Regions:
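Short acidic/glycine-rich loops and adjacent helix/strand connectors
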Residues: 2-290
C-alpha cells in the first residue's frame, strides 16, 4: 500500500511584536515558539530565524522538506494604495515579499550566490510562500482550532493590510468574510491611544491596561467621556471620532489630539503611574496576601 505524503506547513509571523514560527503536519500544529524564548529579546520584531531552526530541528526536517510556507499578512494589498509621502511606512508592508524569502534562504543548502539557479533546480528548492490576508489568518486561527463545525467569527486588532475588524462565517473547512471595517476606524488604535494617554507604551503595554481595567474602581465618569469618542453604527460595527484620534497621521508624535486630553477637565483625572502602582498593591494585599 502506497503511503500518502504528509503535508508540512511552516507558519511565520514577523515584522510586528512577538516574531514566531510554527510547524503543522496534516493540519495539526506539532511545534511552535516565539523568537524571544530563544534570544531573550522580549517582543522582538526580527525575523524568527532561531524559532524556524528550532521547529525544523524538532521534526528533524529541512526547509526543503516543507510543502509550503505561510505568512499571516498579504503585502500585495499595500501596493494598491502606495503613498510616496510616507514611503518609510508603506514599504514596510511590501517588504514582506522579500524579507521572508531572503531570510529563509539561510536554511537551504546552497553555494552563494547561486540562489536563482537553486530556485530553478529540483534539488534544494525553496517551498512556495503563501501570503494570507491578515484578518483571514486571525479568523482561521480562531475557527479551525475550535471544536465548532460552524460559527460566527469576529476579528479585531489595530490593523491588517487595511482592515481593522472583520465579520464572517466559518463552516467546515471554509471561511467567508462578509463585512469589514477599515482604517482609520480601529479598536486596536482606540485601545493603544488610551494606553499612550495613560503614560504607557502603545503597541506594547496594552496588556497592562487590560489588567488594570479589572480593578474595583468606579470609572463611570471616564466611561461617559470615552463614549463621546467612539460610536456604534447601524451595521453593528463602530466609528472613531477622528477629532480625538490621529494614529493614522504618521508624522504626528502622539496617537491622540489635544481635544482628547481636554475632554478631561483636569489632567490629574488620568491616573498617574504612582496611583496605579498603589492600586496594584492594594488589590494584591486585599485579594492574595495572607
Amino acid at each position: 500500500i502506497k503511503q500518502l505524503k504528509v503535508l508540512i506547513v511552516l507558519g511565520l509571523n514577523h515584522g510586528e511584536i512577538n516574531s514566531t514560527a510554527s510547524i503543522s503536519i496534516d493540519g495539526k500544529i506539532v511545534c511552535g515558539t516565539p523568537e524571544e524564548r530563544i534570544t531573550r529579546n522580549k517582543k522582538t520584531k526580527l525575523f524568527p530565524q532561531n524559532a524556524v531552526k528550532f521547529c525544523l530541528d524538532f521534526i528533524d526536517k529541512k526547509l526543503e522538506d516543507c510543502d509550503c510556507i505561510a505568512q499571516g499578512w498579504n503585502p500585495g494589498e499595500n501596493w494598491q494604495k502606495y503613498n510616496p509621502l510616507f514611503s518609510t511606512y508603506r514599504t514596510k508592508r511590501e517588504d514582506y515579499f522579500y524579507t521572508v524569502a531572503d531570510n529563509l534562504y539561510n536554511f537551504v543548502d546552497r553555494s552563494p550566490p547561486e540562489w536563482v539557479l537553486m530556485q530553478q533546480s529540483e534539488k534544494n528548492k525553496m517551498p512556495p510562500i503563501y501570503f494570507v490576508r491578515h484578518h483571514l489568518a486571525h479568523a482561521a486561527n480562531a475557527f479551525f482550532l475550535s471544536p465548532f463545525k460552524e460559527a460566527a467569527i469576529l476579528t479585531c486588532d489595530w490593523r491588517g493590510e487595511f482592515q481593522t475588524t472583520s465579520l464572517g462565517i466559518g463552516k467546515e473547512n471554509k471561511i467567508e468574510i462578509f463585512s469589514t471595517k477599515e482604517l482609520p476606524h480601529s479598536l486596536g488604535m482606540f485601545y493603544a491611544t488610551y494606553t499612550q494617554l495613560l503614560g504607557y507604551r502603545d503597541g506594547y503595554d496594552e496588556w497592562k491596561v487590560m489588567a488594570l481595567s479589572a480593578f474595583d474602581v468606579d470609572c463611570t465618569e471616564h466611561l461617559e467621556k470615552i463614549r463621546k469618542t467612539i460610536k456604534l453604527t447601524s451595521d453593528g460595527l463602530f466609528e472613531l471620532d477622528q477629532s480625538y484620534y490621529q494614529g493614522v497621521i504618521l508624522d504626528k508624535p502622539k496617537l491622540y489630539t489635544d481635544k482628547l486630553v481636554n475632554l478631561y477637565t483636569k489632567l490629574t483625572e488620568i491616573p498617574s503611574k504612582t496611583t496605579i502602582i498603589k492600586l496594584q498593591l492594594n488589590f494584591f494585599i486585599n485579594n492574595f496576601a495572607s
